[in-house]
């Protein structure tokens, strides 16, 4: 009722599908022009959502086929995140689950919810650990305990088939507060992105804190967000083209000190480009003006 009373010209839902209330509002026609942002990186499938505000770098040439909305390809990453929203490193601290644990020689992190990890990719985790004997792989528990338990069983079976002891080399951390997550991101040596449903805000934070992220892009936008961020920043050496390359790249970053140091230097040189892309804001303004006159 409040929205209807305000009579908005344009209504933008940043992430349809992430909040139950928004999920109830989005099917309604509450404004002449209604848009979905890419906070939830899939089509809404709703006839009253007219446009999907996407990213030119994240989408493939035929991406419109993935949307019921008209896809609006905003320049570059389609977003302009604010790095000052992250907690200062000085305020970050390790999670209690890591107290008293000796540091491994190399620490890989997979920062996504296990629900985003496809069973067919579990072998990649095992092969990487097999190739770096002094490495650990850290994961973060799902918001659902049953998913975490199932993932742990999956991981154990797959690692065992590759001769890797998952109990000693795979750590599943509990859900983390932002100050704990900030410490973890800074502490690990490399973030291994998930291909089917890649990171976005986690990738921005990792690079902001100076930690490399490597990825294997998928075909749809939800699996191409880290790829687009790395491509936009010129960090192409951190992008794998195949699953075999994904494994070999992770092993090289963990074992080739010069190659790893070069990636750290590249990240240090581009951190000021992680936020403040005014071209995205100007393009969104232009699109909204044109959408109200039907000139889109």
List each language-model region with its residue ranges.
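A donor-sugar binding/catalytic signature common to diverse glycosyltransferases
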Residues: 10-31, 35-46, 178-226
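Active-site-proximal region of nucleotide-activated glycan assembly enzymes
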Residues: 29-93
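Short, well-structured alpha-helical segments in soluble
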Residues: 1-7
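C-terminal amphipathic helix plus adjacent low-complexity
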Residues: 112-114, 141-143, 150-158, 248-296
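Catalytic binding pocket for nucleotide-activated donors in carbohydrate/polymer assembly enzymes
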Residues: 185-186, 190, 194-275
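Conserved catalytic-core segment of nucleotide-activated headgroup transferases in glycan assembly
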Residues: 76-177, 290
